[in-house]
Design a protein with these regions (language model features):
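Glycine-rich phosphate/pyrophosphate-binding beta-alpha loops
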Residues: 78, 151, 211, 275-289
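ATP-binding N-terminal substructure of ATP-dependent carboxylate-amine bond-forming enzymes
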Residues: 1-103, 109, 113
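Active-site nucleotide/adenylate-binding loops and adjacent lid/helix of ATP-dependent enzymes
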Residues: 1-7, 11, 22, 105-185, ...
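Conserved metal-phosphate-binding beta-hairpin within the catalytic cores
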Residues: 249-282, 290
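Phosphate-binding site of ATP-dependent enzymes
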Residues: 160-243, 264, 268-270
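Active-site "cap" helix and flanking loop/linker of ATP-utilizing ligase/carboxylase catalytic domains
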Residues: 207-258, 285-309
Length: 309
């Protein structure tokens, strides 16, 4: 069994994928022949020192040699990775892959659109609207790009100086920027989804134990933030989060894996975003939440590969 482990990526979360690759590769190569396909920041595919490109049933180099694979795992996050772009190339090459279809990946990548879907399903969300650089904005607020992950380009604004910085930072990445109320006191909860062969698991809620403030990129991947694999919440809150997650997954057409993020303010739950390719670093919460339900990484891949082949 040969699996292409695709990592890196052209987008802003390149380094996150690299960390996940370092964690996953030694685990996978115990059970599979792993073809490490690296995508550089220019969007070029590499197999070791050879440039390759997706072709029918595998990857080909410029000499015409084809490296066949049985399936692929696109360990890519955010723009140009989790948004259906690479998945489209795999689909065109008839390479079975783990994760969402290109259409679903593109849909789930846009926070504003997914919030509208959640609202239509009766799932509470924070009020959000798209803004331009010249809009009048009431303070305090929270500003973030609509199509990026890992909190890239996102920031709080409590005064005019912070507002100008947040706007400049967000619009550096995209013209599609959203504004939300600023929650000074909140808990950040996550629910993991795992689905194969018509059976679905929604994990108990986990929690990001941020030390106050904003859970930004450096906090997520700098090793300073603590997490709880099982959040200390009431059974009612836990079940409600799983219920909301199930509604979203069904409506959006998510398959295989995802992580659904929520805010908890007092007893009020607010949907935040969905990630169709959760992190797989050593610190990542998603694989640990699955492990709490008896699904470690080797078993996860065995079940996922069995679902697509």
């Amino acid at each position: 069994m040969t699996i292409a482990l695709i990592y890196g990526g052209e987008g802003y979360e390149h380094s996150v994928s690299m960390l996940g690759f370092q964690h996953l590769f030694p685990i996978l190569e115990k059970n599979y022949r792993v073809l490490p396909i690296f995508i550089d920041t220019h969007g070029e595919f590499w197999l070791k020192n050879k440039r390759v490109f997706p072709t029918y049933g595998g990857f080909a180099d410029s000499d015409g040699e084809v490296y066949r694979v049985d399936c692929a795992f696109p360990l890519l996050h955010g723009d140009m990775g989790e948004d259906g772009v690479v998945q489209s190339a795999l689909a065109l090459g008839k390479i079975p892959f783990i994760g969402c279809t290109p259409t679903v990946g593109a849909l789930c990548r846009d926070k504003f659109t997914v919030k509208a879907v959640a609202k239509s399903l009766g799932i509470p969300t924070l009020p959000a609207r798209l803004i331009s650089r010249d809009d009048e904005i009431a303070l305090p607020c929270f500003i973030k790009p609509s199509g990026l992950g890992s909190s890239i380009g996102a920031g709080a604004a409590r005064d005019e100086a912070e507002l100008q910085f947040a706007l400049e930072n967000a619009f550096r990445y995209t013209d599609r920027v959203i504004i939300e109320p600023l929650l000074e006191s909140k808990r950040e909860l996550e629910c993991g989804y795992f689905g194969v062969k018509g059976k679905e698991l929604f994990t108990n809620a986990g929690e990001i134990l941020s030390q106050g403030g904003f859970y930004d990129y450096d906090s997520k991947y700098g090793g300073s933030t603590k997490t709880a694999t099982v959040a200390d919440v009431s059974p009612k809150i836990n079940e409600k989060i799983k219920e909301y997650s199930a509604r979203l997954v069904a409506a959006l057409g998510v398959r295989h894996i995802s992580r659904i993020d929520f805010f908890l303010v007092g007893e009020d739950i607010y949907f935040n975003e969905i990630n169709t390719m959760p992190g797989f670093t050593e610190e990542s919460l998603y694989p640990r939440m699955l492990a709490e339900h008896g699904i470690g990484i080797p078993k996860m891949f065995e079940m996922l590969i069995g679902d697509i082949l």
